[in-house]
Amino acid sequence: MGKLSFLLKEPVEYIVERPVIEEALPHRDPFLFVDEVHLFGEQRYMMGLRRFTGREAFFRGHFPNYPVVPGVMILECMAQAVGAAIMQNPKLKGKEAFFMSIDYAKFRKQVRPGDLLKIAIEVLRSGKITKIYAEAYTHNGLCTEAELNFIIVD
């Protein structure tokens, strides 16, 4: 388990559902990869959820006989979950968060059709440049971890 695994059992203070996520993000189907965001009291920790149904187009080619969620799609899920979560902060009203860079990413386990991806998020530094640490979990445990950077613009 990763350092943010405690969030998997943490009581959720507020759930952000799809209509509010769509207000926070410019993404739309078929490229919206966050179903729900969970907020925990303080603005430091958050969680994004995404269920992979197996009907996503990328499974047809990655891989036809053994479908696996591509690692870049897991990173995109992380980025979208972060964007949707941090934009719930009232201090950021009227601003936008843009995914800027990946400091590192490590892929530990596969994510398969039917898996519920739980993305645990920690804000390491907030401001114009916001630094995030994220861990993605499925029922099999920690599958991906990454440090991501975002720029907040007016």
Segments predicted by a language model, with ranges:
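Hydrophobic beta-sheet segments that form the core/acyl-binding groove
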Residues: 37, 102-141
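Terminal leader/tail segments of proteins
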Residues: 28, 36-38, 44-47, 59, ...
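Beta-strand-rich interaction surfaces with strong enrichment in secreted/lumenal proteins
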Residues: 22, 65, 107-109
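Catalytic strand-loop segment that frames the active site of acyl-thioester-processing enzymes
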Residues: 29-69, 87
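Hydrophobic beta-strand-centered segment that forms part of the acyl-chain substrate-binding groove
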Residues: 5-15, 82-118, 143, 151
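Active-site helix/loop of acyl-thioester processing domains in fatty-acid/polyketide metabolism
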Residues: 37, 69-92
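Flexible, low-complexity linker/boundary loops enriched in proline and small hydrophobic residues
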Residues: 2-38
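Flexible glycine-rich active-site/ligand-binding loops centered on an Asp-His dyad
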Residues: 69, 138-154
